[in-house]
Amino acid sequence: ILTALDMMNDGNDWIVDIDLEKFFDTVNHDKLMTIIGRTIKDGDVISIIRKYLVSGIMIDDEYEDSIVGTPQGGNLSPLLANIMLNELDKEMEKRGLNFVRYADDCIIMVGSEMSANRVMRNISRFIEEKLGLKVNMTKSKVDRPSGLKYLGFGFYFDPRAHQFKAKPHAKSVAKFKKRMKELTCRSWGDSNKIGRAHV
């Protein structure tokens, strides 16, 4: 968040917010293994990773082979996904773009709307053609910082400080309050049950 703020306050106040559609479910096995194979030369390790990827999933109590995606909840899945998206990082660095990424949540910051639209087109094409992933164009957008929600934070311009700042996004706060209320009500209900049981 602090890195994003530094970039915004350096004049990069147009945001390219790219949403990857069902990222963990759509990782292309062949492309991922090609990337891994550039670094790992041990055939046994490659074989183990490949077996992990195709280990299958349970859908409605039925076993199905997995031909794409990484196993949900698997210990290796976040690491393998990050290896895939590291290729995106390298491409954006090569293009000299200002960006921050956490897992599959990535935003790019540029200096003009025209640049933002061009980056949206080019990076979306790279993601789909080179990485074999799907960009959700309905959720992806070009926006200003005030319209952005990233990792639970919203951004606003402070005219007195002459800079962008961040604070917990209103939707994140509302979600947190709702969750706390649910937990409190549940705890209160359990306490009442225990109290009645002792009477």
Question: Residue ranges of each PLM-predicted region?
Answer:
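Conserved polymerase palm-domain catalytic core
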Residues: 2-149
